[in-house]
Amino acid sequence: MAGNILLLILDYVFHAGSRTLRVCILSLLILLSGCANLSDLGGGHLTDLFSSEEDEVEIDEAEIVALQTLAPINPLWQVKLAESKTAVFLPVYDNGALYVADEDGRLVKLDPVTGREIWRVETKSQLSGGVGAGGGMILLGTYKGEVLAFDEAGNALWQSRVPGEVLSPPKTDSGIVVVRTGDSKLFGLNATDGKRIWSYQSVTPPLTVRSFVGVSITRGAVFAGFPGGKLIALDLLTGNVGWEETVSQPHGVTELERMTDISSLPIVDENQVCAVAYRGRAACFEISSGNQIWARDASSSMGMVIDNHHVYISEEHGIVAAYDKSSGTAVWKRGKLGSRKLSGLMIVRGNRLVVGDDQGFVTLINRQDGSLLARSPTDGGIILSRAEYLPDGFVVQTLKGGVFAFSLQ
């Protein structure tokens, strides 16, 4: 399970001084990633990775003043769940309700307007992946490879098992539940009873990282990024490969230097699918054929979003960048967000983006020019997952277990 945290520190390590130092540190981390659980690392938590004074970002006075003068985002409500020590949870809005979960095994259904608890299920499992929702089902995963399915009333539907840790939310569409494990295997399960229909395993490089990235499903296809910079389209019903393309080619001498995993969710619109690799490139492809539309240098472990005109990437060192979605041409780039570790992005109403950070702030950004519009704190916990849609705004979940809803009306 220690591998879960490896991805989160790679961008720190690769800026840790000399090449020799980077290789030594990463070599140690790779060895540690084989440990059975975090206790083998001395009980480390995800939050420990961001607490080093060496990694604190130096922000000039003008930047501090600019951030402090931003208007706050209107708070809607907040609830408290258990702290996440080794897992990252994403709230999900589905069929008029919000579902949240925590590492201690709780699944909670909330009223998205008031935050009122509608029901709570104690799964008695250590959850590691969730929440997924669709087709009247709520889906969770565990470190033991269990996939848990509930109906919208909180009743257990079925329980299945896959060989590996389920570190991302299971996805469902067209009667299939797609599960991804930490070692990048994909499984298609029958949504009725959880029985396995198909499985897929990509050929991966000798050195990879485990991450909490899931899959995207649209138009009968499953899109998934893999270690080595590969983007693959699978048939949802059969698991057969439709096409496989390269987002980013590995480069360098050592396996450490050649690591270029796609560690974030591919994004899809009507005509194209795009992905970005860590320490590599971003690229967009035709959704049906896989033919490349454009590619450019970029690096992100938190991913991208797309609208009618642009793709937006949450890049390294606290940078958000916009590129023309047809050509990849740079449109704008925004830094100085008070943090060098950002969450994934989300598009919200009013031509805006929302992004979280490792200091527990959420920031609204103008999609047209990258200007900062508003900013609010949460509980100071790290925000790693992207925000989730609400009818009147959005909601985020921090590693401290805080679930915070904000209004955009």
Swiss-Prot record:
Single GO biological process annotation from the record: Gram-negative-bacterium-type cell outer membrane assembly
Main subcellular localisation: membrane
GO CC terms of this entry: cell outer membrane
Lineage: Bacteria, Pseudomonadati, Pseudomonadota, Betaproteobacteria, Nitrosomonadales
Pfam families the record matches: PQQ_2
Protein name, as recorded: Outer membrane protein assembly factor BamB
Family per similarity comment: Belongs to the BamB family.
Originating gene: bamB
Lipidation (S-diacylglycerol cysteine): C35
Keyword Lipoprotein set for record: yes
Complex formation: Part of the Bam complex.
Lipid-binding residues (covalent, N-palmitoyl cysteine): C35
UniProtKB keywords: Cell outer membrane, Lipoprotein, Membrane, Palmitate, Signal
Organism: Nitrosomonas eutropha (strain DSM 101675 / C91 / Nm57)
Lineage top rank: taxon: Bacteria
Subcellular locations according to the entry: Cell outer membrane
Signal peptide bounds: 1-34
Function: Part of the outer membrane protein assembly complex, which is involved in assembly and insertion of beta-barrel proteins into the outer membrane.
Lipid bilayer topology: Lipid-anchor
